[in-house]
Design a protein with these regions (language model features):
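ABC ATPase NBD coupling module
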Residues: 75-96
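Conserved structural motif at the start of ABC-family nucleotide-binding domains
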Residues: 5, 27-29, 90
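Helix-to-loop junction immediately C-terminal to a conserved catalytic motif
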Residues: 58
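Conserved ABC ATPase "signature" region
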Residues: 126-144
Length: 251
């Protein structure tokens, strides 16, 4: 099967200009491939570069060396060479991202935030609204809050708005940075089922989970950034159960 994401000899470092120009290496010569329907979890200790990898794939960070290639519609885009317009088009149609924290313009209603990815694609406004309302209902956001800005919501409510926005449209490649971290068990199972459904539709998923049960319930292999590149990928069995069933059986 052809890959949707291919990372080749990727290197990244940060330079702290306020600290005398100290160079902080993140990773060197990182390689990975992800195919449609696959789900890989990025693992490693704090500071290993897990979130940085997702931000690099999303185009938030500049690539130090190597390549990040994404199959985008009828061509392959290398993020190391992509223009700003190409990156924006990738985000609109191919690469979805659920970050750790919700970042939105104040005063924009929660319903409009969830609808926005579908609006950007020029779809039917009524269908976009139905999809957004369905996700908000699934994620147990009370209807009385839909017309309010989520900047006033609790942390868990904000994360559910973030997840609803991330899953409103279908993306061939999804990046999930701790999507269940601040959720109660019931909403966590709902999110795991959304991830499972996206995989069944053919989405490739690159994720970060600190909860081992959630990780096993939704992923087929791990990428350990703390290990040598040749030993980075560690498989574990994916039994094809629904995500909530799998989560219930993981210690």
């Amino acid at each position: 099967m052809d890959w949707i994401l291919k990372v080749e000899e990727l290197a990244k470092h940060f330079r702290l200009h306020t600290q005398g120009g100290i160079r902080i290496p993140v990773f060197e010569a990182l390689n990975l491939e992800l195919c449609p329907g696959e789900s890989a979890a990025v693992c490693g200790p704090s500071g290993a570069g897990k979130s940085s990898l997702l931000r690099l794939v999303y185009g938030n960070y500049r690539i130090g060396a190597g390549a990040i290639r994404v199959r985008h519609r009828d061509r392959v885009v290398n993020l190391a060479e992509a223009s700003s317009d190409e990156i924006l088009d990738l985000r609109r149609w191919t690469v979805g991202y659920v970050s750790q924290f919700l970042r939105v313009i104040p005063r924009v209603p929660a319903l409009d935030i969830v609808m926005e990815p579908l609006r950007q694609r020029g779809g039917d406004p009524a269908e976009a609204r139905r999809r957004a309302e369905s996700l908000l209902d699934q994620l147990r956001i009370p209807e009385r809050l839909w017309s309010l800005s989520p900047t006033t919501f609790s942390g868990g409510e904000q994360q559910r708005i973030n997840i609803a926005r991330g899953f409103a449209a279908f993306y061939p490649l999804m990046l999930l940075d701790e999507p269940t971290a601040s959720l109660d068990p019931v909403n966590r199972r709902t999110v795991l089922d959304l991830i499972s459904a996206a995989r069944q539709q053919g989405a490739a998923i690159l994720s970060i989970f600190h909860d081992a049960g959630d990780r096993r319930a939704t992923t087929s292999r791990t990428i350990d950034l703390a290990m040598a590149p040749e030993a980075a990928e560690q498989p574990f069995r994916y039994e094809g159960r629904s995500a909530s069933q799998a989560a219930d059986r993981v210690p």
